[in-house]
Amino acid sequence: MAAPISLKWEEHSLHENKFVRDEDERPKVPYNTFSNEIPVISLAGIDGCRRAEICDEIVKACEDWGIFQVVDHGVDTKLLSDMTGLARDFFHLPTQEKLRFDMTGGKKGGFIVSSHLQGEAVQDWREIVTYFSYPIKARDYSRWPDKPNEWRAVTEEYSKVLMGLACKLLEVLSEAMGLEKEALTKACVDMDQKVVVNYYPKCPQPDLTLGLKRHTDPGTITLLLQDQVGGLQATRDGGESWITVKPVEGAFVVNLGDHGHYLSNGRFKNADHQAVVNSSTSRLSIATFQNPAPEAIVYPLKINEGEKSIMEEPMTFMEMYKKKMSTDLELARLKKLAKDKQQDLEVVKPIQNIFA
């Protein structure tokens, strides 16, 4: 299915509406019914007397949810304000301006409307602009927007500062696993960083769709900066129940990804989450994905006595990623087959009744 150039809700037929989710995938909790279950952790004193206390708080959050929020993280509030302001300015540009950086057709970085795996029938209600920032040699500035004018300078600084914060958090997680503090960073080899800016416009029927479908991130950790609207949701029971993460001004939401989950031998959860939308206001979030290099080996860094590895054998991160994508595609294919079969049965039943 080709990506659209703008988000348009088809009112006349929900069957033809490419944004309508199956009933079991639709939001169960409102975007603004906030939960306090996700801990908010102050990083003040992380390099001093509070390090052990902070480590304990992060460990508990990773074991319970794979998600926590951090404040007092040292990232300048002006940088956060500049980054979010420029992001909103970009999405308010005319469509043709944004489409100059269209990333369909396999282009690495740029702008796209909606998102979905190739082969999936349903799309997400969002626009995104993304760029690859680390390793520096992989940057392709031709794919970075040139409007607003300050975009490149601010996003470069933002990427650098968040790389530093991510490495600091990985040190704490390494120590929590009983390893040297550089262990997780070393396991990433030459750490990748990808920044995805999400814009979720108002939606006419938000109860039928998602801004971003349920998933876990493939990488090590993700740092999410979100506005105060609300819409990030998490589950820890396989999707039976959901909570909406309460936005905290200036905080980063930290999600543990699949790579971090495997390196911890399953001790730390990979955050199971989604984004919902609403009919009242747009929402903005900026996700910074910290991923291992494609050739990095994925396998538990420490297996305690009496435990077994949750992985059958080591694999590269690229192999892990491809396996994850193929599994997701196969699940989507099987679900679509079941849905099509059910629709066929619903057509046949009335015909059978006529001749009964």
UniProtKB/Swiss-Prot annotation:
Which residue windows are coiled coil?
A: none
Q: Name one GO biological process term.
A: flavonoid biosynthetic process
Q: What does the record give as its pathway?
A: Secondary metabolite biosynthesis; flavonoid biosynthesis
Instruction: Please write the reaction equations for the catalytic activity of this protein.
Output: a (2S)-flavan-4-one + 2-oxoglutarate + O2 = a (2R,3R)-dihydroflavonol + succinate + CO2
| Residue ranges of every copy of the Fe2OG dioxygenase domain listed in the record | 188-292
Instruction: Name the domain of life this protein comes from.
Output: Eukaryota
Q: Name one GO molecular function term.
A: L-ascorbic acid binding
- Cofactor(s) listed in the protein's UniProt record: Fe(2+); L-ascorbate
Does the entry feature the keyword Oxidoreductase, yes or no? yes
Q: Name one Pfam family in it.
A: DIOX_N
Residue positions binding Fe cation: 215, 217, 273
Q: Where does 2-oxoglutarate bind?
A: 283
For this protein, what does the record note about how its cofactor is bound? Binds 1 Fe(2+) ion per subunit.
Q: List the SUPFAM superfamilies.
A: Clavaminate synthase-like
EC class, as a word, reads oxidoreductase
InterPro entries per the UniProt record, alphabetical: DIOX_N, IPNS-like_FE2OG_OXY, IPNS-like_sf, Oxoglu/Fe-dep_dioxygenase_dom, Plant_2OG-oxidoreductases
Q: Which UniProt keywords are listed?
A: Dioxygenase, Flavonoid biosynthesis, Iron, Metal-binding, Oxidoreductase, Vitamin C
Task: Give the EC number(s) listed in the UniProt record.
Answer: 1.14.11.9
Query: Which family does this protein fall into?
Result: Belongs to the iron/ascorbate-dependent oxidoreductase family.
Summarize the protein's role. Catalyzes the 3-beta-hydroxylation of 2S-flavanones to 2R,3R-dihydroflavonols which are intermediates in the biosynthesis of flavonols, anthocyanidins, catechins and proanthocyanidins in plants.
What is the official name of this protein in its record?
A: Naringenin,2-oxoglutarate 3-dioxygenase
Q: Which organism is it from?
A: Callistephus chinensis (China aster)
